[in-house]
Each structure stands twice: as structure tokens, then as C-alpha cells.
Amino acid sequence: MNDSPVLVVGLGNPGPKYVGTRHNIGFEVVEELVGRNYANFSVHKRSNTEIAQLPGLIVAKPRSFMNLSGTPIRALCDFFKISPANVLVVHDELDLDFGQVKLRQGGGDHGHNGLKSTSRSLGTKDYWKLSVGIGRPPGRMDPATFVLKPFSKQEQDSVPIMAADAADLIEEHIRTL
């Protein structure tokens, strides 16, 4: 790993209204990662985020809405001098079955507005993305409505396991850098 820290950002929407929704699975993953390292988040005013600093790693939750996530991510990169190649963004993914996780570098945003904002602000799509599968909406439900709904009672039991699996994958990935 080079001298630059790795920035891991969980995407989600701020506020109690969005806690437990599919769109906030990125927050759940980074909260798991920070919690297992006995660390805490604190406000980083210059970037409008909450961050936790671990050895060689900065973990963040933007305090902006999902569609505006790129601005605080860019502010963190500038403040901590982190290149996009050392950024990993954790996000919900409609095109993966519930519970699946997939790590990739670069590539498209799959219509995800948080990733679009991040790519626009970083000036590149060449950063790491950890997609956490939330599945497709049932029937003809609008995907925008689906992602803002809480997980079903049946799914809620699996969310901590999903978050732990995703956090495991992040830790494995960081060891390879």
C-alpha cells in the first residue's frame, strides 16, 4: 500500500427517516467496519461528513443526500490528499440479488445517482465500488420508491450478515493494496 490512506465511503441519506432503508446499506456496511475496530465516527465539518480514522484508512458517511455525495467525497480526497485510485464507495445495487456483494474498479454507475455524483466530482469513474445487492422491486414498483423503503421483516434478519460480509470484503481488499 502506498503512503496515501484508503478512503472508504458508505453511501446513504442522512436523518432518521432513512435509517434501515435499502438506499442506506452503504452506511450500515461502514458502521460495521468501524464498530468492529472499536472506533467511532465524528463530524468532519470541512467535508460535511462523519469520519472514523483507522490505521491507513479513513471511513466516511456523507451528511449530504445520496445524489450529492460526490462533493463531500471530493472534499475528503482534497483534505487528506487521497487519489481516486484509493477511494472505495459502498452502495446499494438493484441489479444484484439481495445479499450479494461485488467489488470492482472503474466501470459505469448503473444508473446510481450517488455514483454519478461521485464520478462527476472526482473527474473519473476509476475508483473502487463495492455493490451490495438489494434486489429488484416487486411487480411494477418504481425503483426510486423501492430503494427508500425499509427492508422487509424477513430481510432485516440478514442485513447485519450482509454488512459483515461486505466489511470482510473491504478488509480483504485493503490488505491487497
From Swiss-Prot:
| Gene Ontology CC annotations of this record | cytoplasm
Name where it mostly resides.
cytoplasm
Keyword RNA-binding attached: yes
Q: What is its EC number?
A: 3.1.1.29
| Principal EC category | hydrolase
According to UniProt, residues marked as the site described as Stabilizes the basic form of H active site to accept a proton are: 92
Q: What is stated as this protein's family in its record?
A: Belongs to the PTH family.
The name of this protein is: Peptidyl-tRNA hydrolase
Q: Which gene encodes it?
A: pth
